[in-house]
Amino acid sequence: MSNSAKDGIVANRVNAGRVNDFVIKLANVNGSGSASANSLLMKTVFRMGVPVTGKNFFPSNIQGLPTWYEIRVSKEGYLARSGRVDVMVAMNSQTYARDLAEVAPGGTLIYDSSWPRDRLLARADVTVIGIPFARLCNERFSKARTRVLMKNMAYVGSLAALLDLDLEVVKTLIEETFARKPALIGANMEAIELGRSYAAEHFDCPLPTRVARLDKTAGCIMIDGNTAAALGCVYAGATVGAWYPITPSTSVMDAFKSFCERYRKDPETGERRFCIVQAEDELAAIGMVLGATWNGARAFTPTSGPGLSLMNEFLGLAYYAELPAVVIDVQRVGPSTGMPTRTQQGDLLAAAYASHGDTRHVLLFPANPREC
């Protein structure tokens, strides 16, 4: 690895090397468009046949605050959080100190060296690599927003070189991701190549920590819990969904609608054989579900803790009237409004003793997407 790179900065090459068994953490700014790039990175590893999982750590705001995305690569299929970070991509200068401290001994930190911070980002047991993502994108793209967005794809390109990712898989995923917006494919491909070519030219690639093709994901799909729950509703015969948007459950109904558009239409006429209603509040949503089940339909509603509280009266009605309603509670943290972008298991007793009087509800606790 060259220590004389013009723009790249390399310090203390100590990468111990972990093939198909490491954690990548990406430090970004919320609202900077990094979600698509991070998802693309994870899907690339999956398409290369290696078990992988992702975890988002993000604030309850629209943009501006720090956000992190963690990807665990595990050839053995261990997909829970491991507690270590082997490769850190630090794209937020506000969190440099924290990001550097999280890297495991022998790990690697990659940062945007458009503004060199080699003195700030220094640790004897960590390899620090600087790549000028902002400068590369500023020189290539003219629109300000495009420059911000393409920085994310540029670091995916650099990681493709550094981690030995299959570039053809990356390109295929870009084409799939932006199939409905073909005008964006070219710019994203350019950004990938910017990052890849810079890393390949200035550093020894791949790193000792890298991805090698396996065949352990054959016959598998990549899916999160909310999407899996929505797919389960389709397989279970649900035709009615009523809801009121609330984080972190909103994507359940988004996914259910998407699946219904594919699998709940009359094959001859194209008519929809499903009903999805956005109610005025959670109490109305559960009321619509009860009305649907009373008329013989299989119906459900997704919600979170505050919504579950509002549904208590009608949950008692469902018990008393023997209506088989399904409530999917995607839990957040805390009482009252709580923390919508954090998770815990604080709703268990509320779900078990929902409504007043003597009632009993069947409670199911999925431990993984397959059980959803």
Model-identified regions with their sequence ranges:
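Thiamine diphosphate
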Residues: 21-103, 240, 247-353, 365-371
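Flexible glycine/proline-enriched surface loops and loop-helix/loop-strand junctions
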Residues: 357-361
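Hydrophobic transmembrane signal anchors and adjacent membrane-proximal interface regions, especially
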Residues: 126, 234, 245, 274, ...
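Active-site oxyanion-binding pockets that recognize sulfate/phosphate
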Residues: 181, 362-366
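Active-site cofactor/cluster-binding pocket
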Residues: 2-236, 240-242
